[in-house]
């Protein structure tokens, strides 16, 4: 028997799914949306929050809520009152979170039109529009940070004792978080110590140049007893983290936060090269940066 006849023939099954190209990776998925900073914060650092929006007229002008988390990390849910909820902290993701949120929203809209409620699942590998393509950018509300996952339930529904107990347990497990008054993107949280995390839409290299200038001058802090401790990189944005003086609340640091934000804005406009001290400060800042997505 010849070599050719001894070769194993590979049969192609008719049931074998067709090749699906992967969803292209997008480093900064929510870029271009007016609420980019809030969406990144909800995805990465805020445990419980709600942001309301509306689709374009082409997609029905439907109102919906983007929320931090849904039961078991599902991507979408339709409450018994018909309200559509789309989750950001989900179990499965493609390389483009904007694609995933839009796919979940469209799936929920279809389920709603079919008279379905409850949790909705999607396959994030399937092609779909991006969030920027299907929402009205002018229709977003202000984000609301809430104490628990009460948004899972119809607000007109009387909760059972089991539901109330579950919410109480969830509330006990949630890291206390609050927006620093008057400063976009700054969020206070209480863990083993109190911290402020600053989500900035400024280009990362420019932001670290600005922070280096402030650090070298001793101004990269939020009041007495605070210090810069590092940074995250998430959804294409840098998120500097400041440890606060013991017991300091969001309100306590509001004035210092305002001064820091103003100083960062001024430093972002600076075009002179970094000094030697500023370069050393920048190296220290970058060495403490961690990518979480």
Predicted regions and their residues:
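Surface-exposed beta-loop interaction hotspot
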Residues: 116-190
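Short, internal acidic amphipathic alpha-helical interface segments
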Residues: 202-234
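Short beta-strand-to-loop capping motifs
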Residues: 88-90, 198-202, 241-246
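Long, contiguous binding/interaction regions
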Residues: 5, 172-179, 289-293
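N-terminal membrane-targeting/anchoring modules of bacterial envelope and secretion proteins
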Residues: 1-149
């Amino acid at each position: 028997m010849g070599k050719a006849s001894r070769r194993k023939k590979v049969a192609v099954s008719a049931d074998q799914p067709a090749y699906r190209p992967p969803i292209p990776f997008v480093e900064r998925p929510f870029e271009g949306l007016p609420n980019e900073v809030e969406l990144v914060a909800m995805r990465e650092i805020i445990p419980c929050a709600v942001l309301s929006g509306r689709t374009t007229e082409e997609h029905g002008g439907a109102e919906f809520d983007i929320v931090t988390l849904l039961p078991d990390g599902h991507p979408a849910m339709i409450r018994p009152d018909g309200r559509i909820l789309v989750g950001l902290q989900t179990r499965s993701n493609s390389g483009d979170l904007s694609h995933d949120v839009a796919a979940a929203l469209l799936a929920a809209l279809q389920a709603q039109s079919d008279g379905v409620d409850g949790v909705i699942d999607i396959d994030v590998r399937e092609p779909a529009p991006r969030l920027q393509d299907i929402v009205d950018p002018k229709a977003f509300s202000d984000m609301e940070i809430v104490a628990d996952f009460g948004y899972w339930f119809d607000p007109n529904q009387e909760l059972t004792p089991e539901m109330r107990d579950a919410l109480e347990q969830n509330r006990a497990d949630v890291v206390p978080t609050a927006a620093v008054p008057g400063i976009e993107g700054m969020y206070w949280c209480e863990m083993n110590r109190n911290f402020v995390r600053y989500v900035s839409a400024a280009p990362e290299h420019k932001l670290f140049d600005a922070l280096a200038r402030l650090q070298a001058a001793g101004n990269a802090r939020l009041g007495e007893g605070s210090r810069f401790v590092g940074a995250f990189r998430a959804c294409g944005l840098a998120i500097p983290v400041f440890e606060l003086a013991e017991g300091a609340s969001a309100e306590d640091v509001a004035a210092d936060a305002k001064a820091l934000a103003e100083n960062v804005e001024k430093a972002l406009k600076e075009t002179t090269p970094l000094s030697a001290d500023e370069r050393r400060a920048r190296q220290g800042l970058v060495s403490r940066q961690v990518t979480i997505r």
